[in-house]
Amino acid sequence: LSYVAAVDLGATSGRVIVFGLDESGITSDEIHRFANQAKWVDDRLVWDFPYLLSETITGLKRAREKYPLVSCGVDSWAVDYGVIDGNNQLLGPVYAYRDPRHDDGMAEFYTRMTWPKHYSIAGIQKIALNTVYQLTGEAGSKRLSEGYKVLLVPDLIANQATGYVGCEITNASHTAMLDARTHRWSPEVLSAASLPSHLLADVVQPGTGLGTWRDKDLEGLPLVSVASHDTGSAFVAVPFNSERPSLVVNLGTWALIGTELSHPVLTDSAREANFTNEIGYGSTTRFLKNVTGMWILEQIRAEMLDGGKQPDIELLLSEMQGAKAFASHINPDDPVFGPPGGMVERIRQNVKGDIPSNRSEFVRCVLESLVARVAQRVGLLGELTNTTYQEIVAVGGGSRMDIVCQWLADATQMPVVTGPTEATALGNSLVQWLANGDL
């Protein structure tokens, strides 16, 4: 067996999973799972990066004790970054994408470049959390003035692990600073963001060797660049049907609706629909739309406790089936549902129809609203690509929810097949095996 470790860092949890490959197939073993949550510090929402690094090391140590690892790879959510100095020391915090101050950066950026021009270059949807707007809001700050490089979260982990400095391309594309055609940093976009080009690292491809870990317990363990944006890794693992057009619905904290193309779609219609063109493994294009996924449900679970503990998803789904169908509705993408905390009250204040009065009604409202939003975007994807899709491949944690998959099939009148639940971690591992010559 060839064993590799996939480190998959999500906005609400992280995990280290070991995958084994031989002629009979693939095995998996979840070694370590840990919670992740942005916290308010001095009125800013930040990630605890030292904790994420420590938990990554803990998981890899346990994996290495149990398996003869050939390599490891790290993926995470997109857009957030740290700044290092010339000695690879982290300058300041890693701000979280749900920090409301990012809105100011987006407004400032578009005083220097029009939205149509920006989309024609980068092809990335306009949403306040994008890296380019975060950096625009931070332009001229002390840490950017003193900093050596801006590194996205997986690249920051790699830097602290091996000293490597670079920016993996699938994650780089999501910053909205990379040219969708040339796959290089756009001087025009950087100028509009008031960002000196020397702060950005060279772009590298998935499968690049990043050196070996320097931690005493992980010394010598190779680190391989994977499709480090978690969606990029998930798409690597999607079992696309070659006989009929398929699209992907990745049901995680975010729900992503998209497909894989050979080229970006930079039309006016795509821009007006705010679809995004992300670079995928093998220089493909992931043409997709982000909508709020399980985030609202996760927040409800955190508020509506059972004896001080979060209720199991299975219990919530069972309770929900006793609630009235289509009694209430929210727009999951309304910015009011973006920040953490107080979600139940915000639903009460912004719901259409009956105001939910118990947990089962809240859960049904949230999941029905999510499915309706996803189904709408599925139809729009077909229009923008001029394709009649015949199958939906559901991946991610939400694909475990049979009733949600059935609702989606009913709403779209398409068969829904489930791909790997841990598609991101599997895709992470597949790229490692390709890089190591095992596939």
Each PLM stretch: what is its role?
Residues 61-130:
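Active-site phosphate-binding/coordination module
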Residues 51-64, 182-188, 373-380:
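Short, well-ordered amphipathic alpha-helical segments that serve as non-catalytic structural scaffolds
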